[in-house]
Curated annotation (Swiss-Prot):
SUPFAM superfamilies: beta and beta-prime subunits of DNA dependent RNA-polymerase (SSF64484)
Gene Ontology MF terms: DNA binding; DNA-directed RNA polymerase activity; ribonucleoside binding
Assembly information from the UniProt record: The RNAP catalytic core consists of 2 alpha, 1 beta, 1 beta' and 1 omega subunit. When a sigma factor is associated with the core the holoenzyme is formed, which can initiate transcription.
A GO CC term attached to the entry: DNA-directed RNA polymerase complex
GO biological process, one term: cellular response to iron ion
Signal peptide positions on this chain: none
Taxonomic classification: Bacteria, Pseudomonadati, Pseudomonadota, Betaproteobacteria, Neisseriales
E.C. designation(s): 2.7.7.6
The family this protein is said to belong to: Belongs to the RNA polymerase beta chain family.
Organism field: Neisseria gonorrhoeae (strain ATCC 700825 / FA 1090)
Record-given protein name: DNA-directed RNA polymerase subunit beta
Length: 1392
């Protein structure tokens, strides 16, 4: 087995019972692939598919003028290079975007020509605004902040059939409805009312009988009835009435007369129910007609107009009910044959027939006018307007788009559905198979007449009791709109606005000799894009607390947003877990608040298909044998198969074992024989999301607690020294690498140079491109602020001389340790009560943990100050500030900006700024002072940037931005100079490395070769030696050597050109950088200068901080106890944390107990390894012990492939504790945990005996740190990976003495952000009332709150030393009086 360079250093012992068939896919693929498909930068202009930008342009262009003689055609588009790179955009607060230019062709036709003739073609490039670019990690930089476009899970376009579940009508009758949802355009609804009449409505407007729509589509009454009904023919004669015998219609009917065979024998007696046997007898008897009573004709509806063949008189119209009078009329006129609609109460209802009777519109035009009046009430219906509106509703590509998905969904639900035998022979089968044959193939992206009729027919058939309604929560009916598609829609809407403006101007294009760029104004496009990325509900400020929160945010799918649900209207069904979520959407990870179930996370292996439906992978099973073939199935496809679980037992050949296997079929769990199984899950963790799959022993946790665990891992603050979890799940490495927090090698090579800021790798010859210099330079991110103010800092994980392969770890980032996600610290935990300090989930923690900086984190705050141009003059950033103490000034440089490295506290000046003050009337004293001391100090006020209250830290960076045309101060200039110097050093280093690498390659290439001549009198035919090369004055002279081998000579020339090119590139890059830095900055209007100060704040763990494990076991630190008072073990080691044992049973998150036991084993194994290393045991003994660890149970590791040195390095990395992986749903069993505990703490070891273990080695004797006595019973002790969450008491607690007031109520503001005070609310008043503390209450409600006069008076009294209270009227009472007056009630106060 091949281990990577990093994996060798610390192999994670996995307890997985099954081989991993499919690697965890790239976790950000959804975002990155979607946007790449939108931009199509990789494809040549002519190879671009009709997706993304290309599709948007194609849908709007060509734009034709109103007169038809000019048109604009789209040729292709190009994206330029972004002006600034990502870090520069973040610093300057601008958007990381590239200019979009489209090649547009203006075609002008000849007006005089008889047929369309091109008169003139003008073509040029048109600037279409800027398109934000995605960063390599799947986010966007918008106005300097990283944002994520969350994917949306919305209802798929298509046709959906449902019923109201009996909720609308009191009788509980099911009212069926259908809805045709397009991607863009009007919604068309069909619905039954309680009287079984069928209505339609457009865009949820007023409902109308559905026959109006059918008439508007061109059908008359007879045609409508012909579509929706089977017919019955009755033959009238003097002997009675007969009808054609249709056997299928007789079943379940009662015989109205005796049914006789040809011999006169009774087959079914009158009044008897006709059974299936009777039908067989009737068919065998060869009867073709049946006698019926004349009364049975009454109430039936005629299928067609009855016309007297002689006179042409219409005796009765289609859909007329047959009455006694009508029968008499038929008799008089000698009608021998009538055709009626076949209707029965059971499965052929009279819905359309009855609806037609309520519809009074005469024909096609009248129906269209009725629809126009409903859509545009109050507007006069002219013939042209009526036609235009009706066509634009569903039949125009400009205003209606069903989309490819919608058409596919529509066809599969209507034309391509499987029909039963009875349906095949009915009107419905004839309609789909004969009348509308081929309609599915020709269906475009607009609706056709056939589509509307087929939808109505399917709804009627549903009401008749045939077929199933759709489940709208099924993932086959919900699709994912990712970032590319969302951006495309915005871009298209912007282009549509451009189109309207262009059409107006196109008529003048020829006369005014305009070019395409004169016609097109790109502002609407860039405004639409800007609005979407800046303020859309789906464009969210990226959660960047730690790498997991980044990855999870990018994998989120939301049902909210434009075109989606709203949290107020979403019911339980939408939020609930659905069987189709299996392997697609995580059933665990979702927010706890009002958004529960509306915001979900993609499962680990889920992906979207071309239509936007979620798919999950399965292994194919053939005849009970599981193959290596993997198919991705969508929720619709999955319903057709029987699927076994990933943990089904297999033999060595991959055959399913056992008589019955647990499977899923159509969302139900069943037991099936192995030969029925068609697919099998690829992995046990396929069901859950990334965050949930990071929880070890998830299978032993209650779902509610697992949900909290998954959510709280995203809030874990990166610690100063990240520590890998001893008990993990094996997916930690994927998260660290895919989040781009940890850096991996792009190409294999040898590490040439390492320092804290960069790593240089000389690429292997076989991976370097021929003739190119192979060097990769990785610049590390140092102390950068994340969106949540946490610290992003990368640390090199390699040494000079290390040999790396592609994909090996180069540097660790925040919250990663040796390329694995490390969100918290491994803590030794005891479950026991301790003096009530762990009551209600409180956490008792050792002082040693805080002193060792285990949970110390660095937070970086950014503070800004701007100098504006005011009416009274420009604000000035300066050191010369009135009334500023010497101590404060010492921290500022001559420009008035704080030094880097200064330690600052609340109230300290960071940037000195003065603002001109309005001239005021001076008192004589002030005039005197001005005359003596000059006038500078008095006409400006101090508006400096000061350190906010409750904050202290170290200044780590300062950035100064100056508007174009304003002279830079010394500090700004020195920042630019140092930046340029650093950049030049970087470039020089790169060039030096390139040079060294190139000349090393040349040396290997030419030493030993024959030369034709060269410098220092190298003769023809002589061999080139290392000594000769070393003796040349400069290495660049090597290029003058003439080689006999022509191929080598060419390669030498290529390297020379490559080096020259690199040098030129470096100079060019330096000039670009210089230009960027020296040009003025784009600042907001009126702003002359902006200074950003970055402050690093060190937050140590303290009482009040929130902490949690990975199983939803959260709590608040109640006390940090001196280490000598903590409970300790027999060997003197104190525990780190004491948790409450009562927090476990009721919460049912037993996973934490198993984690603690396995962590205890990991720690014990680490201690044994540490002892062996200290005793300098041989590598063979270490290898033997590691073999017991890795190859006892679970997944086997190939330790034989490691050298002795690698074994020793592996062992030294396990000193603090072994690394275990317990994959989700395939984790360590109890027996395996016991095995590890026995390996860690062998019974024969005297050290182990001293600890006082119980039989299972899960509990030990602990001693009270204060008294030294042993506790009464043994205590569960172990190691748990514990996290510090981003709810720090420092950020929550604040105190106010005086501060801002609300102007209206005169009461203090609330909240830390407003520096508010505490509210003495209604319930607090009740408490004082209950105690009868009248004076305290009066004081609270008046002088201490909003009694303005009373407050002033109180201050005066205190100053004078008179301790008495003069309470007045609270301002809030005045507000109440005003409120009552505003309602028109006069209220006055009368004084007594």
């Amino acid at each position: 087995m091949n281990y990577s360079f990093t994996e060798k250093k610390r192999i994670r012992k996995s307890f997985a019972k099954r081989e991993n068939v499919l690697e965890v896919p790239f976790l950000l693929a959804t975002q990155i692939d979607s946007y790449a498909k939108f931009l199509q930068l990789e494809n040549a202009f002519d190879k671009r598919t009709d997706d993304g930008l290309q599709a948007a342009f194609n849908s709007i262009f060509p734009i034709v003028s109103h007169n038809g003689y000019a048109r604009l055609e789209f040729v292709y588009y190009t994206l330029g290079e972004p002006l600034f790179d990502i870090p520069e955009c973040q610093l300057r607060g601008i958007t990381y975007a590239a200019p979009l230019r489209a090649r547009i062709r203006l075609v002008i036709l000849d007006k005089e020509a008889s047929k369309p003739t091109v008169k003139e073609v003008r073509e040029n490039e048109v600037y279409m605004g800027e398109i934000p670019l995605m960063t390599p990690s799947g986010s966007f930089v918008i106005n300097g902040t990283e944002r994520v476009i969350v994917s949306q899970l919305h209802r798929s376009p298509g046709v959906f059939f449902e019923h109201d579940k009996g909720k609308t009508h009191s009788s509980g009758k099911l009212l069926f409805s259908a809805r045709i949802i397009p991607y863009r355009g009007s919604w068309l609804d069909f619905e039954f009312d309680p009287k079984d009449l069928l209505y339609f409505r457009i865009d949820r407007r007023r409902k109308m009988p559905v026959t109006i729509l059918l008439k508007a589509l061109g059908y008359n009454n007879e045609q409508i009835l012909d579509i929706f009904y089977d017919k019955e023919t009755f033959y009238l004669s003097s002997n009675g009435v007969q009808t054609d015998l249709v056997a299928g219609r007789l079943k379940g009917e009662t015989a109205k007369v005796d049914i006789l065979d040809k011999e006169g024998n009774v087959l079914v007696a009158k009044g008897k129910r006709i059974t299936a046997k009777n039908i067989r007898d009737i068919t065998n008897a060869g009867l073709t007609r049946l006698d019926v009573e004349q009364e049975s004709l009454l109430g039936k509806a005629l299928a067609a107009d009855l016309i007297d063949s002689e006179t042409g008189e219409v005796l009765a119209s289609a859909n007329d009910e047959i009455t006694e009078e009508l029968l008499a009329k038929f008799d008089i006129n000698g009608v021998k044959e009538i055709t009626t609609l076949y209707i029965n109460e059971l499965d052929q209802g009279a819905y359309i027939s009855n609806t037609l009777r309520t519809d009074e519109t005469a024909g096609r035009q009248a129906a269209r006018v009725a629809i126009y009046r409903m859509m545009r009430p109050g507007e006069p219906p002219t013939e042209e307007a009526v036609e235009q509106l009706f066509n634009r509703l569903f039949f125009s590509e400009d205003s209606y788009d069903l989309s490819r998905v919608g058409r596919m969904k529509f066809n599969t639900r209507t034309y391509e559905q499987k029909l039963s035998e009875a349906q095949q022979n009915s009107w419905y089968g004839r309609l789909l198979n004969e009348t509308f044959a081929g309609a599915a193939d020709k269906g475009g992206y607009v609706l056709s007449v056939e589509d509307i009729v087929a939808s109505i027919a399917t709804l009627v058939e549903l009401r008749n009791g045939h077929g199933e309604v759709d489940d709208i929560d099924h993932l086959g009916n919900r699709r994912v709109r990712s970032v590319g598609e969302l951006t495309e829609n915005q871009f298209r809407s912007g282009l549509a606005r451009v189109e309207r403006a262009v059409k107006e101007r196109l008529n003048q294009a020829e006369s005014e000799n305009l070019m395409p760029h004169d016609l097109i104004n790109a502002k609407p496009v860039s405004a639409a894009i800007k609005e979407f990325f800046g303020s859309s509900q789906l464009s969210q400020f990226m959660d960047q607390t730690n790498p997991l929160s980044e990855v999870t945010h990018k994998r989120r799918v939301s049902a909210l947003g434009p075109g989606g649900l709203t949290r107020e209207r979403a019911g339980f069904e939408v939020r609930d877990v659905h069987p189709t979520h299996y392997g697609r959407v995580c059933p665990i990870e979702t927010p706890e608040g009002p958004n529960i179930g509306l915001i979900n996370s993609l499962s680990v292996y889920a992906r979207t298909n071309d239509y936007g439906f979620l798919e999950t992978p399965y292994r194919r099973v053939i005849d009970g044998k599981v193959t290596e073939e993997i198919d991705y199935l969508s929720a619709i496809e999955e319903g057709r198969y029987v699927i076994a679980q990933a943990n089904a037992d297999l033999d060595s050949d991959g055959n399913l074992i056992g008589d019955l296997v647990t499977c899923r079929e159509k969302g139900e769990t069943i037991m099936a024989t192995p030969d029925r199984v068609q697919y099998m899950d690829v992995a046990t963790g396929q069901v859950v999301s990334v965050a949930a799959s990071l929880i070890p022993f998830l299978e032993h946790d209650d779902a509610n607690r697992a949900l909290m665990g998954a959510n709280m891992q995203r809030q874990a603050v990166p610690c100063l020294r990240p520590e890998k979890p001893m008990v993990g799940t094996g997916i930690e490495r994927s998260v660290a690498v895919d989040s781009a927090t940890a850096i991996v090698a792009r190409r294999g090579g040898v590490v040439e140079y390492v320092d804290a800021n960069r790593v240089v790798i000389r690429v292997h010859d076989d991976e370097a491109t021929a003739g190119e210099v192979g060097v990769d330079i990785y610049n590390l991110v140092k102390f950068t602020r994340s969106n949540q103010s946490t610290n992003i800092n990368q640390r090199p994980a390699v040494k000079a001389g290390d040999v790396l392969q592609r994909g090996d770890l180069v540097a660790d980032g925040a919250s990663t340790d040796l390329g694995e996600l490390a969100l918290g610290q491994n803590m030794t935990i005891a479950f026991m009560p301790w003096n009530g300090y762990n009551y209600e989930d409180s956490i008792l923690i050792s002082e040693k943990v805080a002193a060792d900086d285990r949970y110390t984190s660095i937070h970086i705050e950014e503070l800004n100050v701007v100098a504006r141009d005011t009416k009274l003059g420009a604000e000035d950033i300066t050191r010369d500030i009135p009334n500023l103490s010497e101590r404060m000034q010492n921290r500022l440089d001559e420009s008035g900006i704080v030094y880097i490295g200064a330690e600052v506290e609340a109230g300290d000046v960071l940037v000195g700024k003065v603002t001109p003050k309005g001239e005021t009337q001076l008192t004589p004293e002030e005039k005197l002072l001005r005359a003596i001391f000059g006038e500078k100090a008095s006409d400006v006020k101090d508006t400096s940037l000061r350190m906010p209250t409750g904050m202290s830290g170290t200044v780590i960076d300062v950035q100064v931005f100056t508007r174009e045309g304003i002279q830079r101060d010394k500090r700004a200039q020195s920042i630019i100079d140092s930046e340029l110097k650093r950049y030049r050093l970087d470039l020089n280093d790169q060039l030096r490395i390139f040079d060294n690498d190139a000349f090393d390659r040349i040396e290997r290439m030419i030493v030993g070769q024959k030369a034709n001549g060269g410098p220092m009198k190298l003769t023809k035919g002589s061999e080139i030696t290392t000594e000769y090369l070393a003796g040349l004055p400069s290495r660049h002279d090597w290029f003058d050597i003439r080689l006999t081998d022509e191929d080598l000579a060419k390669q030498l020339e290529l390297i020379k050109l490559s080096l020259q090119q690199k040098r030129e590139e470096a100079d060019e890059l330096y000039e670009i950088k210089k230009k960027k830095l020296t040009q003025g900055d784009e600042l907001q209007p009126g702003v002359q200068k902006m200074v950003k100060v970055f402050i690093a704040i060190k937050r140590r763990l303290q009482a009040g901080d929130k902490m949690a494990g990975r199983h939803g076991n959260k709590g608040v630190v109640s006390r940090i106890l001196p280490v000598e008072d903590m409970p300790y073990m027999a060997d003197g080691r104190p525990v780190d944390i004491v948790l409450n044992p009562l927090g476990v049973p009721s919460r049912m998150n037993i996973g934490q107990i198993l984690e603690v036991h396995l962590g205890w084993a990991a720690k014990g194994i680490g201690e044994r390894i540490d002892r062996m290393l200290k005793e300098r045991r041989k590598a063979g003994e270490l290898r033997e012990f590691l073999n017991k660890l890795y190859n006892g149970s679970g997944k086997k590791e190939d330790l034989d492939s490691l050298t002795d040195e690698e074994i020793i390095e592996l062992a030294s990395n396990l000193r603090k504790g072994a690394s275990f992986a317990s994959p989700v749903f395939d984790g360590a069993k109890e027996s395996e945990i016991r095995e590890m505990l026995n390996l860690a703490y062998p019974s024969e070891d005297p050290e182990v005996e001293k600890l006082g273990f119980n039989d299972s080695k899960t509990q030990i004797t602990l001693y009270d740190g204060r008294s030294g006595e042993a506790f009464d019973r043994k205590v569960t002790v172990g190691v748990m990976h514990y996290l510090k969450l981003h709810h720090l008491v420092d950020e929550k607690m604040h105190a106010r003495s005086t501060g801002p007031y609300s102007l209206v109520t005169q009461q203090p503001l609330g909240g830390k952000a407003q520096f508010g005070g505490q509210r003495f609310g209604e319930m607090e008043v009740w408490a004082l009332e209950a105690y009868g503390a009248a004076y305290t209450l009066q004081e609270m409600l008046t002088v201490k709150s909003d009694d303005v006069n009373g407050r002033t008076k109180m201050y005066e009294n205190i100053v004078k030393g008179e301790h008495k209270i003069d309470a007045g009227m609270p301002e809030s009472f005045n507000v109440l009086v005003k409120e009552i007056r505003s309602l028109g009630l006069d209220i006055d106060l009368e004084r007594y």
